[in-house]
Amino acid sequence: MEKKPLVVVNGLVRKDAIAYLKEHVDVRQWTEKTVMPREVLKEWLIDADGLWCVRPLDVDSDLVKNAPNLKVIAQAAVGYDNVNIDELTAAGIPYGNTPGVLNETVAELAFTLIATASRRILENANFVKEGRWAQRPSNIKGFDLSRRTLGIIGMGAIGVSISRRARAFGMTVVYHNRNQRIDDKIHKTTYMELDDLLATSDVVCVMAPLTDETYHMCDETFFKKMKNTALFVNVGRGPIVDTDALINALKTGEIDYAALDVTDPEPLPANHPLLDVENCLIVPHIGSYTDRTRYDMSILTADNIIAGVHKKPLKTCVNEEVNYKKPQMDVESALEELKKAGVDLTDCD
């Protein structure tokens, strides 16, 4: 019997995805609840054909330099700020992520945060639980979303999905990107320079990826340019925000409220000062955390790995230049396949 390719999984993932993976490859998985030591992982990779990357893990040339059989690395995530794509490309290793699968789910969470924060749902619910129904102060009254302006920073597919929900609530949507989209009329959105967006928006939602350019983009100067009545939402990446600057902006009234799915650091230590800020709602990075979406992400990751270890094209490859190519079919083989499919070629010139 032909030996199956070996895939290393450096952490805990869905059991159904592992079962699916094992139908096609041999799996060696780190099943401890602790983070797998990097040196141990490097030893495991010596004989591996594929790696299912589980955060936290920095993927670079150092990790894969002694893995001569490694043909693919994949991760159940859209973002890949923990992966050095240039170094993997130089090593000829395709990297697969999971775009498209989670767009609607993350957009739902982003707009849930916007709606929850705008009406101070958490604070008002707590007043009821505490038996203080009639004592809630006026500063948690909230505001309407209709006739307000939502500014989206990072208008990719998820941003477009958020904008669709915002318009259904009667909001005007503006956005800032590295480049203006060509489909503004279709989505009824307006491109703005960043400073104009900050000055105009009642809600600022960050959806940008983490890059050298976006690291700490939301700093002291950024928050000073926002309305002091504005709501700030981050569903992108934690390090895009200077956490100290955000804390100061919330405490001094430079902005009114923040709702965060991501933080820096992440997870937040129990004694972190951001947790003491009353006008800040934090959830533990649950943007894609629904059962169906996590399943779809896991299966797509498994499919990318299965394809890669067999040197077949990954469905979703970031560094497409080193993705495996479909073999070219010669004319005779193509005609034979058409005949097998029942195509009548007798009338073809």
Give each language-model segment a name.
Residues 138-228, 336-349:
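Rossmann-like dinucleotide/phosphate-binding beta-alpha-beta segment
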Residues 99-149, 161-164, 183, 313-320:
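Phosphate-binding beta-alpha-beta segment of Rossmann-like dinucleotide-binding domains, i.e.
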Residues 30-33, 76-77, 93-104, 177, ...:
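Short beta->alpha connector loops at strand-helix junctions that form conserved
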Residues 49-129:
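Phosphate/diphosphate ligand-binding glycine-rich loop within oxidoreductases
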Residues 46, 59-63, 178-273:
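Rossmann-like adenosine-cofactor binding region
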Residues 95, 172, 220, 229-349:
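Rossmann-like dinucleotide-binding domain for NAD(H)/NADP(H)
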Residues 1-48, 170, 325-329, 333-334, ...:
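N-terminal glycine-/charge-rich "phosphate-binding" loop or analogous flexible N-terminal tail
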Residues 10, 54, 76, 207-210, ...:
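Short, well-ordered coil/turn residues at beta-beta hairpins
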